[in-house]
Design a protein with these regions (language model features):
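Secondary-structure transition/turn motif
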Residues: 1-2, 198
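Extracellular beta-strand-rich solenoid/capping regions of secreted or surface-exposed proteins
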Residues: 2-10, 29
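Extracellular beta-sheet/turn segments enriched in Thr/Pro/Gly and aliphatic residues
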Residues: 3-5, 17, 157, 183
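Extended, structured, electrostatic nucleic-acid-contact surfaces
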Residues: 8, 13-14, 92, 130
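N-terminal segments that cap or nucleate solenoid repeat domains
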Residues: 8-11, 21-25, 184
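Right-handed parallel beta-helix
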Residues: 15-71, 75-77
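Short, surface-exposed interaction patches in beta-rich subdomains
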Residues: 54, 63-200
Length: 200
């Protein structure tokens, strides 16, 4: 397997665009207004990335993002393979989707986000959702932990086939005029979440 390594001077770039047919793609310590990444077959690994907007398309292979901060708009499309987000912050609006594969979202913040999975579990660990966010799963469980002020966050959960438990409640938290709203919809699968008050 051949490897191509590109080293860029430390700078804030207007645009970084990479396209890959076959092979793994690793991107580290990049700061750009616009980031566009496309890969057909291979794993993608992003670490310490900041930008205004980010578009990632991965057809076959795993996708891992760590310490990625996007200020305005995020679009992540993962076709076949697992998706892992760790210590990430997505402000503005974000659309994150997988077709076949599990999602693992850890210690990350989302604003105005839509997170969708066709086939595969969605695992959350200490994630925070601001404004109006939606999690959808066709076949797979939604499980884990949230950082949420339940006095200012409305959590609306529903599954067609499966059970629901949010802090032991079957209906989540219905808060009138809530600052933040998280809607969870599952066709076939369980919803099991716990909440913890975020630290100031």
């Amino acid at each position: 397997t051949s490897t191509i390594t590109l080293s860029l001077p430390m700078n804030v770039y207007e645009q970084v665009e990479l396209q890959n047919d076959i092979g793994n793609l690793t991107l580290q310590n990049v700061h750009a207004d616009r980031i566009s990444l496309k890969s057909d077959t291979g794993d993608m690994d992003l670490q310490s990335i900041t930008g205004k907007s980010c578009s990632i398309t991965n057809n076959i292979g795993s996708l891992s993002l760590q310490e990625v901060q996007i200020r305005e708009q995020t679009d992540i499309q993962q076709d076949t393979g697992d998706l892992e987000l760790t210590d990430c912050t997505f402000h503005g609006s974000s659309a994150i989707s997988t077709q076949i594969g599990s999602m693992h979202l850890s210690d990350s913040e989302f604003s105005a986000a839509t997170i969708e999975s066709d086939t595969g579990d969605i695992r959350l660990k200490d994630c925070t959702f601001y404004q109006v966010c939606t999690i959808k799963s066709d076949v797979g469980d939604v499980k884990g932990s949230l950082l949420a002020d339940v006095n200012n966050t409305s959590i609306d959960a529903d599954t067609d086939v499966g059970s629901i438990s949010i802090d032991g409640k079957k209906n989540g938290y219905q808060v009138p005029n809530a600052l933040n709203t998280l809607t969870i919809r599952v066709d076939t699968g369980d919803i099991r979440l716990t909440t913890q008050q975020p630290t100031a």
